């Protein structure tokens, strides 16, 4: 269908978001046009502010507005454990259960040989650097139960084993192919409690 150029551009912009197809992008574009000028300005302002003000924590790699982030600077956290996740959304999911009190490391991606993504393409070197001369005695791998998540998990385990650091993996309460960010709190709690050593 032929839309006026401004609407077509808006549809194109929305369709670049993950999980947004052409129909949803069209609905969002038309809804945005129907919003009040004040709401559209607030939306645009918030979007620009988030893009401008957010950065990655120089310690853990989590998306934050403070560097280092609030978790890395919290002295009450257990500094002997680091939970490794794919992205910042996974940290939020784990924090919701209010059970894990250790630190995090965000990989900002997964090793994916099929997509040409290797260990050097994700935030892995900084994890290894963090572990040198630290009090960490356990690294808990909490990547998603996908082929790329498993490949990443096995790689991290192989790299860290010679250093004598205990490497564990979340227990299988998470269905294969599922994302941590969508798991319910009870499933995540059981996965942490029943983690297995690699």
UniProtKB/Swiss-Prot annotation:
GO MF entries: DNA binding; zinc ion binding
Domain (Toprim): residue spans on this chain: 80-175
InterPro entries: DNA_Rcmb_RecR, Rcmb_RecR, Rcmb_RecR_Znf, TOPRIM_dom, TOPRIM_RecR
ZnF (C4-type) residues: 57-72
Superkingdom, taxonomy of origin: Bacteria
Gene Ontology BP, a term: DNA recombination
SUPFAM superfamilies: Recombination protein RecR
Cited Gene3D superfamilies: 3.30.60.80, 3.40.1360.10, 6.10.250.240, RecR Domain 1
Pfam families in the record: RecR_C (PF21175), RecR_HhH (PF21176), Toprim_4 (PF13662)
Entries under PROSITE patterns matching the protein: RECR, TOPRIM
Keywords: DNA damage, DNA recombination, DNA repair, Metal-binding, Zinc, Zinc-finger
Database matches in PANTHER family: RECOMBINATION PROTEIN RECR
NCBIfam families (UniProt xref): recR (TIGR00615)
Functional note: May play a role in DNA repair. It seems to be involved in an RecBC-independent recombinational process of DNA repair. It may act with RecF and RecO.
Family: Belongs to the RecR family.
Protein name as catalogued: Recombination protein RecR
Organism: Streptococcus thermophilus (strain ATCC BAA-491 / LMD-9)
Gene behind this protein: recR
């Amino acid at each position: 269908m032929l839309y006026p150029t401004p609407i077509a551009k808006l549809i194109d912009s929305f369709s670049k978001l993950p999980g947004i197809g052409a129909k949803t992008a069209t609905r969002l574009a038309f809804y945005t046009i129907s919003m009040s000028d004040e709401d559209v300005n607030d939306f645009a302002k918030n979007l620009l502010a988030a893009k401008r003000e957010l950065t990655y924590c120089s310690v853990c790699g989590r998306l934050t507005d403070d560097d280092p982030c609030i978790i890395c600077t919290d002295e009450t956290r257990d500094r002997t454990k680091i939970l490794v996740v794919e992205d910042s959304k996974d940290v939020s999911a784990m924090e919701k259960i209010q059970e894990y009190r250790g630190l995090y490391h965000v990989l900002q991606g997964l090793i994916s040989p099929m997509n040409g993504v290797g260990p050097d393409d994700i935030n892995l070197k900084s994890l290894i650097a963090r572990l040198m001369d630290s009090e960490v005695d356990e690294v808990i791998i909490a990547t998603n139960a996908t082929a790329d998540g498993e490949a990443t998990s096995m790689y991290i385990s192989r790299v860290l084993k010679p250093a004598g650091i205990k490497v564990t993996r979340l227990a299988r309460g998470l269905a294969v192919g599922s994302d941590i960010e969508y798991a319910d709190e009870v499933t995540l709690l059981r996965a942490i409690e029943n983690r297995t050593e690699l």
